[in-house]
């Protein structure tokens, strides 16, 4: 076999530059004109600072509750407001459905056999009447991710809202609860220690999930009003009408500080019983039992549960009562900080003129044949070195984003586009975050439309990522965290924030 052609080839030689502009592209004497691809690199220093932020958009899978004081971050207090997911049309009171197992949430089919083995299973319940509320609780389930002193005694109050949260609105964490609640109707209170909350199995499908739970006793008068909304003759026919009658609840931190918890679910549960005709068998023959005749053994006991979930309007309220500690951190001459929730951002100033000038000095003003291969903004992180219950290493993911676009980014579930938003994970090999700015730098060098807005007003914020199938979702971090980065004043050059720029020019 003969090869009748010779494949041409080209050499790509990278000229590596640290902080100077003296290096030139190499390889011109090797390749013919028109085939040459010269490479260059620059290091561009950037400046950074900490800026205080008093609120962020609330759009999260979780709610947060409690109060914790850190030596340097000061006090963080978490409360929340929420509507109820009424499920109008999906719930009726009294509920006569039957369950095949003994459960305080339903009517057990085999209840009568426990009274008299000659009875058979309950087949149906008819003529339900005389509903009576027995008790009501606002239940708050949280996982093991707790921050603070779990043995400290703290308390919460649950109030009825007097005004509705705006529908389909952007809710921010500095919302004033007084705009929606005059605190004139206290529904319930609870003093608790996080460590002592009993563990309860609540999964009936064998998964054995065991969350911690807070049970706040709720006013029976309020519970009766809610139950009436689900009766057959109720005038409430949809969620909007329900919200007009019951705008929601405000869960407020009452006293003392201890721990902050991450809430998985929370809901109002009302227990009630009623009377009715129980259709069953006795010694194999059909019979009807009047529940009144059973007295305290009446099996017609049910519950009504309505959740404060993501399908309704809700918002966390974050307060930093003594933010002087945060402001002191923001003035640090050694580090910048990105903390959560709603406290400090690291602001990064990218001087695009410095980027352009460094390129012009090497290749001239013509950028038509220029390609930006890499423009990595590197931030070197440092562990927290003070006594704290916070995680001392940086948040796993950071986002560099135009500050004015933060709310829209998270509200519309956007993903980093490499123009106005950039994501980076912690590189544990050198404890740094690297944000790829190459696309934005390229567009601005080429003078693309509106490119003058790129790389402006940038801040670094902590985020976390979830996924569903192949889709990734980015969420602003609302759990208390603290990350810090070296400033340009760091003694070691390698610790200073900078952009490592690599670009090529076709001759």
Predicted regions and their residues:
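Secreted, disulfide-rich extracellular signaling modules
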Residues: 2-9, 13-507
